[in-house]
C-alpha cells in the first residue's frame, strides 16, 4: 500500500470516530429529526456515508460490497429519510459505519483492491483507480462531516 492510501485511511478513520463521538449522546428522536430547511437527518447522513463508501470503493470499481446493500439503499444519493429509524437499526448502522471502514482498511492492506474498473462521475470526472476512489470518498466524507456537525449543533440547542 502506498503512503497516500495510508493517509486517506487515517483521515477517514478520524472523521468516522469524530462523528461517532459527536453523536453518541443523542437519542433516536434527535438522530431522526430533520430540522426546518434541511432535507435529511443525522442517521441518514451516517448511513449515506456507509452506502457511498461501498459504492465508490467496491461496487463501481467492479468489486463485491462487504455490507447488505439492500438495507443501506435507503441512504443512497438522492434519497431522503422516509421512515423513523429505530434504536436497534441505529445500533446496526453505527456498527456498520465502523466495521465496513475497518474491512476496507483490511482489504487495502491485503491488496484485495488493487484492480479497479474505471468509471465516470456525473460531473464527467473519471475515477481510474482505487486511489482515486479513496480520494473521492475522503472528500465526500468530509462534506458530510460538516453537515453532521451542523445538524448535531442544532440538536444540542
Q: What are these model-derived regions, one by one?
A:
Residues 12, 16-19, 23, 97, ...:
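Hydrophobic alpha-helical core bundles mediating ligand binding, dimerization, or RNAP-core interactions
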Residues 15, 93, 140:
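Hydrophobic (often cysteine-bearing) scaffold residues that line and stabilize catalytic clefts
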Residues 1-13:
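Extreme N-terminal tail/first-helix region
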Residues 9-10, 20, 30-77, 119-157:
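Short, contiguous alpha-helical
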Residues 25, 45-48, 107-110:
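Conserved catalytic core of Hanks-type protein kinase domains
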Residues 78-116, 132-137:
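Acidic/histidine-rich alpha-helical segments that form the ligand environment
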Residues 17, 28-31, 54, 102, ...:
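Generic structural signal for secondary-structure transition and capping sites
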Amino acid at each position: 500500500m502506498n503512503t497516500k492510501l495510508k493517509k486517506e485511511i487515517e483521515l477517514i478513520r478520524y472523521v468516522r470516530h469524530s462523528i461517532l463521538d459527536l453523536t453518541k449522546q443523542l437519542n433516536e428522536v434527535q438522530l431522526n429529526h430533520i430540522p426546518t430547511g434541511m432535507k435529511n437527518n443525522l442517521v441518514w447522513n451516517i448511513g449515506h456515508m456507509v452506502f457511498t463508501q461501498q459504492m465508490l470503493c467496491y461496487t463501481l470499481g467492479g468489486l463485491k460490497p462487504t455490507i447488505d446493500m439492500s438495507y443501506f439503499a435507503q441512504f443512497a444519493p438522492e434519497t431522503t429519510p422516509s421512515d423513523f429509524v429505530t434504536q436497534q437499526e441505529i445500533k446496526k448502522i453505527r456498527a456498520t459505519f465502523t466495521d465496513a471502514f475497518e474491512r476496507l482498511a483490511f482489504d487495502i492492506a491485503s491488496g484485495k483492491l488493487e484492480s479497479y474498473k474505471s468509471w465516470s462521475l456525473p460531473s464527467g470526472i473519471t475515477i481510474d483507480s482505487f486511489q482515486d476512489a479513496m480520494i473521492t470518498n475522503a472528500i465526500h466524507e468530509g462534506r458530510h462531516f460538516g453537515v453532521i456537525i451542523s445538524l448535531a449543533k442544532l440538536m444540542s440547542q
